[in-house]
């Protein structure tokens, strides 16, 4: 952070992540109507103007509510399903740049512990907050995070927080694992 401003940080993230968001959304729009089948019941009922609206919202990474779904899977971007994980990555990057980068090792350790509790809550289906009751078929799994419903938001946040905070803590305590020829 000595050589990079917050603006530069955000710019680097956008340059790295956003071209694929746009490309995936445009490809999804081109092939949208070809996906008509029983697994995607809403496709043939979707007017073209709504697809264009979803293209705009998808390219801008504006998540859509369940009521705007055009495929039937309640995704935040019906044209580019995997962007749900990038949405969480964008949120993590924003929080990191504005706040989390200032956390001490102790504060990061506390957040790791809290995030671990959320992870355990989902993994063992403890359901501390009463959000997992509707997930009978997906109980004891981390399937979810791609929709703007309370249970999906909880799963998405949990999937983000633990690995994010553990990675930051490991980086701060210089306990990085070196793997010979791990990346070329």
Residue spans for each PLM region:
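Alpha-helical transmembrane segments and their immediate interhelical/interface regions
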Residues: 1-21, 74-84, 148-152
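Transmembrane alpha-helical segments and their boundary/interface "anchor" motifs
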Residues: 2-38, 42-57, 92-93, 159, ...
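Aromatic-enriched alpha-helical transmembrane segments of multi-pass intramembrane proteins
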Residues: 50-184
